[in-house]
């Protein structure tokens, strides 16, 4: 049987099962309320297991612990006048024992017709089976929601991997690993928030639709505001609005929210992604690197219980101080055959990028060429956490220039497992310098660089009130979760990743 024929047969089987279950649902409707909403749960599965699973049967029976649990029925064993069912809730699983003598003949007859996937409620007393499993001996059992579509079998293979992303609801039902990933994601985000609040930062919300896209070099999504008859752009970064708040006197601010970039999709990129950006007055990029280390270590502890984690079979040490290299130092560290003279020769660097199959930057000055070469020959080798520092000014239009190294900025990017995780810098707070850099970006855009920034006159106006010395940083939440949950693809850590239409 071909794959197409097999898929057709499976579809026919599923349609038949769904038709039968709709008939069951109709029978339930005829008896009364098909979707009751008056059940009150008293306990979750895992806390019950944690508190009582180790107890001896006699001791548990003596306590007479009454519970009301509910969840999706994942297993069912009918044995004449009694049956076992396993219910799954958000915390875990617990077994129920349903006997005709305890729940009544009519209810038991109904229960035997129920299907895997039904949402079931059970009231009763805890006891231990002969095999020692903690179980609820049901005195009452009810269906709360009828399953129509049969549960999928265990996901495996490429086709099913796509199904996991498209039907995350089914994936979460069937995969404990997926549920654990997204529970960890929530804990990671909460820990980031806790660290920021503990450091005296104020959480704020800034616009998601911008009249001028800014704060990063990227292609925006464009929409139209009908009432104002004007284009708007889904934000590519909140940076310029957050720095406006620092101008206004909110000296430590952060935002955890979505950014949108109308660019390619890959295992590392989703058009809609989550970041934290934070800004602190009277600080610099050194302080931002310290904050970044703290955030990542604290998140590792809450997600993994350790600062040493394993990613795709290889250890990552987040506990020791992160390494620091300039772009040229990193290139030479991993490519000792290159000489200082070669790396200072723009023409040679450009030819080496081409030889390696890389793409030349839109504005090929020496600094941007060195960065492009770094991306070709060193970036993927940065396994343990490494700050790459002192970026060239031509690729850092919002970063403060170095006082000691002309042409460079006080900027860093953090790389772990060969991919960027954070970007930060001492903020440029000279409005005249910022205006000139915006003009240079406009020139690049006019020359064909559609990722170059627009000129933001209102941001310049804000800076003219005086932006104090400020450090800022952005950390990609999705990539951090990938690292801490050992996920190979960004789609594994986004509940509903973007997909091509079916």
UniProtKB/Swiss-Prot annotation:
Binds 3 Mg(2+) ions per subunit. Homodimer. One of its GO terms (cellular component) is cytosol. GO terms for biological process: lysyl-tRNA aminoacylation. This is Lysine--tRNA ligase. It holds the Pfam family tRNA-synt_2. Mg(2+) 1 binds at residues 413, 420. Keywords: Aminoacyl-tRNA synthetase, ATP-binding, Cytoplasm, Ligase, Magnesium, Metal-binding, Nucleotide-binding, Protein biosynthesis. Mg(2+) 2 binds at residue 420. It comes from the Bacteria. It is found in: Cytoplasm. Its EC number is 6.1.1.6. It catalyses: tRNA(Lys) + L-lysine + ATP = L-lysyl-tRNA(Lys) + AMP + diphosphate. The keyword Ribosomal protein does not apply. It is an enzyme of class 6 (ligase). InterPro entries: Aa-tRNA-synt_II (IPR004364), aa-tRNA-synth_II (IPR006195), aa-tRNA-synth_II/BPL/LPL (IPR045864), Lys-tRNA-ligase_II (IPR002313), Lys-tRNA-ligase_II_N (IPR044136), Lys-tRNA-synth_II_C (IPR018149), NA-bd_OB-fold (IPR012340), NA-bd_OB_tRNA (IPR004365). Belongs to the class-II aminoacyl-tRNA synthetase family. CDD domains: LysRS_core, LysRS_N. Residues 1-22 are annotated as: Disordered. One of its GO terms (molecular function) is ATP binding. Its cofactor is Mg(2+).
